[in-house]
Amino acid sequence: MTETITFQNVLDHLLDSKKEIPQAHLKLYSDLDPKSLRLFMDVWPSVKPVRKLLLLNELINHLEVDTLVTYEEIGRALLDDPDGDVRARAILLLAESDDPKLAAKLTNILLNDTDLAPRMEAVNLLGEFILLGELEELPEEIQRKAEDALITVIRSDDNSALRRSALEALGYSSRPEMVTLIESAFERADPAWKASALRAMGRSHDERWNDGVISTLLDEDPRIKFAAVEAAGELNIQEAGSILLKMLEDEEEDDDVIALGRRQRCHLAH
């Protein structure tokens, strides 16, 4: 007879750092009711830091293979955790959320968190909320505040990777400032900035960027080339088809670029 595993059993197991976290336990962290969440938060301070990250990584990975689970309750509860790595992973647990209140929280994290990791994850998820706003599925005021925060970061002297991610996230936005921001990034000598500009172009679904994308499809830098191939597919640039074919015939081409190019060419053909 199989013994029933209670959530208290799961928490007791979590506290024992010598034991591996069984896959069977991961579902029991899903969709916690208020009582279970309180139990979880009561024991959380006693869990060793490495063990905390191990659990959160397991939950994040499990989200990708099991569409029936949700760890939003845990994610929300840990957004204010004192450990920046925990906060970053908490945001990843909220990747499927479309709650407007979360967008406001992410905006605050982006502007005020003291650690880079949660700010990076906040930027990435804010991009999804900007898209919801463009689809009129997010209150206009919340979208505007999120866009303002992203623009502030892009124009700041903050971490370069964070600023580039903010540009990519804002690519979904129809704000008039986007044209200048994308152009400025595209004209930089830094390949990383040019690649981010191309990703923003693709997300904009604005054909004004078609020529810029086509001009970089055969760029020598793989970062730029990969982003250009992505953008060509997202913008549905039919003229890119012949260039992608040439790319696929190049035996020295990067494997990742070839794989993406093959997918995008099939997309353009249909």
Describe these PLM feature segments:
Residues 19, 34, 49-53, 84-85, ...:
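Alpha-helix N-cap/helix-start positions at coil->helix boundaries
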Residues 2-3, 114-115, 119-131:
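Long, contiguous interaction/recruitment modules in multidomain scaffold/adaptor proteins
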Residues 60, 95, 127-128, 171, ...:
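Structural signature of alpha-helical solenoid repeat scaffolds
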Residues 254-270:
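Short, compositionally biased segments
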Residues 1-66, 77, 82-85, 125:
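Intrinsically disordered, serine/threonine- and proline-rich low-complexity regions
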Residues 22-23, 53, 57, 88-89, ...:
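Alpha-solenoid HEAT/ARM repeat scaffold
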Residues 2-9, 32-44, 65-80, 99-112, ...:
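Amphipathic alpha-helical scaffolding segments comprising HEAT/armadillo-like alpha-solenoid repeats
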Residues 15-27, 53-63, 86-91, 127-138, ...:
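Boundary/linker elements of alpha-helical solenoid repeat scaffolds
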